[in-house]
Amino acid sequence: MAKKITKKQARKETAAAVENALEKYLSTTLSADEGKQAGDTSPLGTPYRRGSVTLRGKMVPRHSTTGKLISEEPGTDWRDADPWRTLRIQSEFVDGFDALAKLGPAVSIFGSARTEPTDPYYEHAMQIAGKLANKNIAVITGGGPGIMEAANRGAALAGGTSVGLSIELPFEETTNDWVNLGIEFRYFFVRKTMFVKYSSGAIFFPGGYGTLDEMFEVLVLAQTHKIGNMPIVLFGTEYWQDLVKWIKGPLLDQNMISESDIDLFTVTDSHEEAIRIATSGITSK
């Protein structure tokens, strides 16, 4: 039987994991600085994003925003106090609303940051995004590499609006080069608000914890009617089939969800079907 841990222990373990990831990022950045010769592009290493601020080299902080947010230890820096943090959160909402207010119809594309350009799903994401752009529909992603880069690339090459909603993480790269409208966030919940507020549909490609987190949050918002008509597409039947089997099996059999909840998403391998369903929330308005 698994040993139960307290909330305090869980917070400490999470904070430690964040700090370990940050240390790994810093060691990689600093080691990349060594051996740089005159004339190299830059000796400062990979940029670190903190909201709208870009930091490199020695200016990269040793503690992350997330680590401070979940810490129970009282902070000595007034910038870490809850009232100041509240203002910072408000400013992120204002920046996001201001940047996206006139975006127009849009579809969000989610997926793994680890997908390589040689992966077939990368090409699928590129093509679907390009086809959306050709319909004058903006494409919104998390702004990172992998599937996100592929979708931004497809939209940009088609001459469309390619949006990247990036997040401050100590172990991920900066916004990909195919974003033509980018916003940097510190807080996941602000970023997620922008996804659901400005998208009329969502397409989920294969991904890990981050993609699953985003997918289930959108499903819950649709299930509880917190958002309106939000068509949800899972692209890649081979990848999603076991998850769908679990949802239609134990979840439904044990009355954890309703029959109607199964209809909240569609699984497909077809570009045309994915686009038709994802944009049905736009065409029905």
Question: Locations of the language-model features?
Answer:
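C-terminal functional extensions of proteins
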Residues: 234-285
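Acidic/glycine-enriched connector segments
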Residues: 146-205
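Glycine-rich phosphate/nucleotide-binding loop
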Residues: 174-177, 212, 222-230, 237-245, ...
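Solvent-exposed alpha-helices and their adjacent loops that cap or buttress functional pockets
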Residues: 100-102, 131-133, 155-156, 173-177, ...
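Short Lys/Arg-rich cationic patches that frequently serve as NLS/NoLS or arginine-rich RNA/DNA-binding motifs
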Residues: 1-9
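Glycine-rich beta-alpha loop segments
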Residues: 10-165
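Short, glycine/serine-rich, charged loops/turns that create anion-binding
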Residues: 114, 169, 239
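Active-site/ligand-binding-proximal alpha/beta "capping" segment
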Residues: 186-238, 280-285
